[in-house]
Amino acid sequence: MVVFSKTAALVLGLSTAVSAAPAPTRKGFTINQIARPANKTRTVNLPGLYARSLAKFGGTVPQSVKEAASKGSAVTTPQNNDEEYLTPVTVGKSTLHLDFDTGSADLWVFSDELPSSEQTGHDLYTPSSSATKLSGYSWDISYGDGSSASGDVYRDTVTVGGVTTNKQAVEAASKISSEFVQDTANDGLLGLAFSSINTVQPKAQTTFFDTVKSQLDSPLFAVQLKHDAPGVYDFGYIDDSKYTGSITYTDADSSQGYWGFSTDGYSIGDGSSSSSGFSAIADTGTTLILLDDEIVSAYYEQVSGAQESYEAGGYVFSCSTDLPDFTVVIGDYKAVVPGKYINYAPVSTGSSTCYGGIQSNSGLGLSILGDVFLKSQYVVFNSEGPKLGFAAQA
């Protein structure tokens, strides 16, 4: 573990800026997420989200979760519960609102190649006059909740914040499932995992970050997701106004294409820390925290009335319950997730029973630290090493 203080980070940032000065195209930039309108309602399939997260990493989806997802257990909700964080991106001639996902490596979008019935409510990608279709290339993604998308591949111009590339692989959807069509706030996904897991065939393509990182002052991006508010992505630099204390760094394991790392333990509420560390993935594209069964059971033993519900497809409890904090130990740093973040959402409209933000990883062998965890942290994803940095949000 390496701990960088704000002062050290500033000195490193200054030295980087000096060494980069001869190359005027190198830069750093911030891109803000967009909040959904407060009066916009939509349907969220909670067990479907859970199933998709498990399947994304090759996990087994329990039968109870499959059945709950197929029944469409849902809550109609405005922009709360932080199910997705959307960011404006210019793709070709279109500005789209995309889900930035550190757990995948594809940039796929709704396009004008979709049937008209699947286009309604979405902003669409239209290839620019300079776009090149990659003949014989295709992509096809399926998730555990039954959702899927597939289509063609183009080489086109993509702009995020202050950085543009005219040679980014853009995966244009020509077929898409109803689960995605119904989410009219979301026009696609921008993957920020390692390019080794890009799904384009016959040859994998590079992520946007890998394509543009040579233009940045430093080959990194930092994430500040927020609770009940839009968050921020910083590319190429670390903003010391967004965190308190020091950034604790740990080696990232990219062997499976994800931003993986090893923790050094955990604690629940005011209890003492367990020294049993676990392997984890930092994933902005997963909503929940998915942990080993023994940790999940230990957590909900501290929640009055909590139970694992077959019907709901996960742990539930009374919405009025005060939940204990959950802390992940990384070196000498303790990343605290407030209990209120773990009270994720009612299991259905008007219900007094809520769905937990911590659920089982179903024997996956890896824990997934999704948005419920990340929105309490300022997290640095540095491709040099690679390494991950964690600090409490300011």
Swiss-Prot record:
Superkingdom of this protein's organism: Eukaryota
Glycosylation sites: 129, 304
Residue spans crossing the bilayer: none
Gene Ontology molecular function terms on file: aspartic-type endopeptidase activity
Gene Ontology BP annotations: proteolysis
Entry EC number(s): 3.4.23.18
Propeptide: 21-69
Disulfide bridge positions per record: 319-354
Assigned GO CC terms: extracellular region
Keywords, alphabetical: Aspartyl protease, Disulfide bond, Glycoprotein, Hydrolase, Protease, Secreted, Signal, Zymogen
Signal peptide: 1-20
Domain Peptidase A1: residue ranges: 85-391
Compartment(s): Secreted
PROSITE patterns: ASP_PROTEASE (PS00141), PEPTIDASE_A1 (PS51767)
Protein name: Aspergillopepsin-1
Species: Aspergillus phoenicis (Aspergillus saitoi)
Protein encoded by which gene: pepA
